[in-house]
Structures are given as structure tokens and as C-alpha cells.
Amino acid sequence: MSDAKELKQVLTGPIVNNNPIALQVLGVCSALAVTSKLETALVMALALTAVTAFSNLFISMIRNHIPSSVRIIVQMTIIASLVIVVDQLLQAYAYQISKQLSVFVGLIITNCIVMGRAEAYAMKTPPMMSFMDGIGNGLGYGAILLAVGFVRELFGNGSLFGVQILHKISDGGWYQPNGLLLLPPSAFFLIGMLIWIIRTYKPEQVEAKG
């Protein structure tokens, strides 16, 4: 029973209670860049989830054999190898999305969420729970990306996943898109609003004043 409870906490905790973006403020740079469309936000979320989950798994499997002095190098080597695999798969099967994501898939290597979970969790926890932790943090990251991408694409372009929902004035409709929402700074403000909303309803997440 305790294992099931811990598994549930590992999977669902990062979505709201310990969200890597909203609480820890990690991985913000990619969130600003890839959320102008829901499609790219979803693919980026899936890519980071896969890399985080499998890097956690592999690092946890060999954690007792990694010398402390080179552990960061080993972690980065595993993460970089997985990022290359994900990038090649995207180029092979989703080339247009891969072009839109540009360098941001490659920059998963330096994403604080991936490195943070590898160092703080996978190095101390058995493989299966580490794998689930990677999925949970990927879900938390993806939830913020999809929420921001939903607002930016719908109100910035009047569409969702490329399908026109709000018919634009330029096409004879009624909606005037807000082009500002398609610019990266808008994502910064939207993420800030999400953090404010979450911390309003969960005041325990507010940092203590020193």
C-alpha cells in the first residue's frame, strides 16, 4: 500500500504540488520558445518526458557503480545520448515539427529539470521509481507548456493544433488575433500568471521571507 501511495505521489506530485516550472522555476527558457503552437508544445513535452524518464532509469541502474568525482559527466553523457536519439526520431518521423523546434530539442541536454532529477532523485532511488519520477516531472512540465500554448495559439492566432477555431477578421470572420501573444515575452507573463494563481490557492508554495 505504501509503495502504491509513493508511486502516486511521484507521478502526480510534480503536476501541481511540486511542478518543475511553477514551483521550482526550472526549464523556463524552452517554455518561452516552443509554446506559440500547441503542436510544438506537445512534442517538446513528450521529448523532455522521454529523456527525463529514461535518463533517470539508466542512471539509477548504474548509480552504485558511478564514482562521485565523475557522476555529472556520466549523467550528461547518458542524457546527451538520449537527446540525440529523440532528435533523430523527430527528424525521421516529424521533420516539420523538428524544424520548428530547431535547437530547443538539443538544449534538453542542459535543461535543469533533467539534470536536477538525475542528480537529486535517480542517484538515490531504485530504477523503476526513478523512471516514474521522470514521467511525473515530464507531465508537470508538459502541463504548463500545454496551458501556455493553448492560450497563445488560441488567442494569438485563433487556432488550436493548426485548426481554425476563432475565425479571423482577415478571413471574413469576427475575431481580431492578438499578435503579441505569439511573441516569446507573452509566454513569460503567462507563466508568471500561472505561478501566481497556483501560489494563491496553495500559499504553502510561497517562499518564506528572510
Curated annotation (Swiss-Prot):
Similarity comment: family membership: Belongs to the NqrDE/RnfAE family.
Known role: NQR complex catalyzes the reduction of ubiquinone-1 to ubiquinol by two successive reactions, coupled with the transport of Na(+) ions from the cytoplasm to the periplasm. NqrA to NqrE are probably involved in the second step, the conversion of ubisemiquinone to ubiquinol.
Regions crossing the membrane: 14-34, 42-62, 72-92, 103-123, 131-151, 178-198
GO BP: any one term: sodium ion transport
NCBIfam families, alphabetized: nqrD, PRK09292.1, PRK12405.1
Tree of life domain: Bacteria
Subunit architecture: Composed of six subunits; NqrA, NqrB, NqrC, NqrD, NqrE and NqrF.
Protein name as annotated: Na(+)-translocating NADH-quinone reductase subunit D
A Pfam family: Rnf-Nqr
